[in-house]
Swiss-Prot record:
Gene3D superfamilies: 3.30.160.20, 3.30.230.10. It comes from the Bacteria. GO terms for cellular component: cytosolic small ribosomal subunit. Pfam families: Ribosomal_S5, Ribosomal_S5_C. The N-terminal domain interacts with the head of the 30S subunit; the C-terminal domain interacts with the body and contacts protein S4. The interaction surface between S4 and S5 is involved in control of translational fidelity. Belongs to the universal ribosomal protein uS5 family. GO terms for biological process: translation. Keywords: Ribonucleoprotein, Ribosomal protein, RNA-binding, rRNA-binding. Residues 11-74 form the S5 DRBM domain. With S4 and S12 plays an important role in translational accuracy. Located at the back of the 30S subunit body where it stabilizes the conformation of the head with respect to the body. The lineage of its organism: Bacteria, Pseudomonadati, Spirochaetota, Spirochaetia, Leptospirales. Part of the 30S ribosomal subunit. Contacts proteins S4 and S8. GO terms for molecular function: rRNA binding; structural constituent of ribosome. This is Small ribosomal subunit protein uS5.
Amino acid sequence: MAYQDEESKEYSEKVVKIDRVAKVVKGGRRFSFNALSVVGDQRGKVGIGFGKANEVPDAIRKSIESAKKHLVKINFKGHTIPHEVIGKFKSARVILKPSTAGTGIIAGASVRSIVEKAGIQDVLTKSWGSSNPVNIVKATLDALEQLETPILAAKKRGISLNKLFGKD
């Protein structure tokens, strides 16, 4: 149990969205809640989770547990991302562009939460299409999963780093 307590301390959590939904039954409406959360260690690991329950705290707890189970390693070094990337999920599109040190995170609330939890400090973003926070967060995670360090890109293509940067 102590191991689990230590593990939970190193991750920071952010609730992106809480929604009340209703199921119409013969006696009226039965309300429940769902929550979308982002969890990250601010050193390159980030995850998103979705939880549903009859009470808000239970939905939040479930979403955070789900996010911790679905952590993804993001390939970046330093303060920004190595290259421009576009993430897609359903009709949501998110573009992430590297920026110079000191720029900060230029992003909407949904994109900002996942980029901050990943540990990226300087990035320019633009989202279009669906404005649903669930779709935007998943599109952002898709974009972050596409990131490659120059070493990985060169290895994948079977060329040297010098050739990758056009110095050969």
